[in-house]
Curated annotation (Swiss-Prot):
<dbReference type="InterPro" id="IPR000243">
    <property type="entry name" value="Pept_T1A_subB"/>
</dbReference>
<dbReference type="GO" id="GO:0005634">
    <property type="term" value="C:nucleus"/>
</dbReference>
<comment type="similarity">
    <text>Belongs to the peptidase T1B family.</text>
</comment>
<dbReference type="GO" id="GO:1990111">
    <property type="term" value="C:spermatoproteasome complex"/>
</dbReference>
<keyword id="KW-0221">Differentiation</keyword>
<dbReference type="GO" id="GO:0005839">
    <property type="term" value="C:proteasome core complex"/>
</dbReference>
<keyword id="KW-0647">Proteasome</keyword>
<keyword id="KW-0645">Protease</keyword>
<dbReference type="InterPro" id="IPR001353">
    <property type="entry name" value="Proteasome_sua/b"/>
</dbReference>
<dbReference type="GO" id="GO:0002376">
    <property type="term" value="P:immune system process"/>
</dbReference>
<comment type="function">
    <text>The proteasome is a multicatalytic proteinase complex which is characterized by its ability to cleave peptides with Arg, Phe, Tyr, Leu, and Glu adjacent to the leaving group at neutral or slightly basic pH. The proteasome has an ATP-dependent proteolytic activity. This subunit is involved in antigen processing to generate class I binding peptides. May participate in the generation of spliced peptides resulting from the ligation of two separate proteasomal cleavage products that are not contiguous in the parental protein. Required for adipocyte differentiation.</text>
</comment>
<dbReference type="InterPro" id="IPR029055">
    <property type="entry name" value="Ntn_hydrolases_N"/>
</dbReference>
<keyword id="KW-0539">Nucleus</keyword>
<keyword id="KW-0888">Threonine protease</keyword>
<dbReference type="GO" id="GO:0051603">
    <property type="term" value="P:proteolysis involved in protein catabolic process"/>
</dbReference>
<dbReference type="InterPro" id="IPR023333">
    <property type="entry name" value="Proteasome_suB-type"/>
</dbReference>
<keyword id="KW-0865">Zymogen</keyword>
Length: 104
C-alpha cells in the first residue's frame, strides 16, 4: 500500500521480492532462519520468487521451503509438467504437502 501511495502504481512481484530481500540482507549473520516464497500476478504475468535469511533472491517456476522440502521436491519433480491443468496442479501441490508433512 505504501508503494502505491508513493508511486501511484501497484508494486510488481519482482519489486516486492527485492524489497524483502533487501530487508533480510540487513539481518544476515544474526542467526535467523527463514525461507519465503513470494508469488503474485502483475503486468508481466505470474511471478514466483524465493527469498532466504541472507537476502538471497531467486526467480523460478517451482520452489519448496521448510524442513520437509526435500520430500515435497520428490513429489513435485516426479509429477510436474508445464501443461498441467489447474486441477492437476492443485492435486500435485496437495500431494507434495502431504508427503512432506508425513515424512518430516
Amino acid at each position: 500500500r505504501l508503494y502505491y501511495l508513493r508511486n501511484g502504481a501497484r508494486i510488481s512481484v519482482s519489486a516486492a521480492s527485492k524489497l524483502x530481500s533487501n530487508m533480510m540482507y540487513q539481518y544476515r549473520g544474526m542467526g535467523l532462519s527463514m525461507g519465503s516464497m513470494i508469488c503474485g500476478w502483475d503486468k508481466k504475468g505470474p511471478g514466483l520468487y524465493y527469498v532466504d535469511e541472507n537476502g538471497t533472491r531467486l526467480s523460478g517456476n517451482m520452489f519448496s521451503t521448510g524442513s520437509g522440502n526435500t520430500y515435497a521436491y520428490g513429489v513435485m519433480d516426479s509429477g510436474h509438467r508445464y501443461d498441467l491443468s489447474i486441477e492437476e496442479a492443485y492435486d500435485l501441490g496437495r500431494r507434495a504437502i502431504v508427503h512432506a508433512t508425513h515424512r518430516d
